[in-house]
């Protein structure tokens, strides 16, 4: 799998996430894929680790029900062998509070047999916490 193929698969997964299409997201993952969102659980209750299609479906369904990705852009991508590091910018809206924020994340992706076998996302827990707060405090 070359760089272009890997970025195409990653892009398909991101596009499905923006659409809120859980099954479309699952289509780019292997059946035993590991999926991790790394965050401090006390600050952002979306920290999670899953393995396999059923666990990923449950987690992704919960994420789609909680956070709407209004826009997602790939800023940088580094591909080496079967691995990729992707920096993305996301406009996110909390479906619980209506709060909106723009943030960036770093996604580490590993491929096997043309699909994502491991996906780890690092994101700003302060932004996630702000999105989930019932009333956001604005600093002046």
For each predicted feature, which ranges?
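A beta-strand edge to alpha-helix "cap/lid" segment located at domain peripheries
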Residues: 1-5, 64-140
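Short, low-complexity N-terminal intrinsically disordered segments enriched in polar/charged residues
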Residues: 1-31, 137-140
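A solvent-exposed, acidic/Ser-Thr-rich amphipathic alpha-helical stretch
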Residues: 3, 30-81
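Hydrophobic pocket/interface hotspot
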Residues: 13, 25, 33, 52, ...
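Phosphate-binding glycine-rich loops and adjacent basic patches that engage nucleotide phosphates
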Residues: 17-27, 49-50, 68-72, 92
């Amino acid at each position: 799998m070359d760089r272009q193929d890997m970025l195409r698969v990653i892009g398909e997964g991101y596009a499905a996430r923006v659409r809120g299409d859980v099954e479309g997201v699952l289509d780019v993952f292997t059946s035993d894929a590991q999926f991790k969102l790394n965050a401090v659980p006390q600050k952002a209750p979306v920290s999670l680790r899953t393995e396999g299609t059923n666990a990923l479906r449950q987690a992704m369904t919960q994420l789609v029900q909680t956070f709407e990705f209004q826009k997602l852009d790939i800023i940088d991508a580094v591909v080496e062998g079967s691995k990729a590091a992707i920096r993305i910018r996301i406009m996110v809206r909390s479906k619980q509070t209506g709060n909106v924020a723009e943030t960036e994340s770093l996604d580490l992706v590993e491929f096997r047999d043309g699909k994502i076998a491991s996906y780890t996302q690092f994101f700003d827990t302060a932004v996630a916490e702000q999105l989930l707060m019932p009333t956001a405090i604005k600093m002046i």
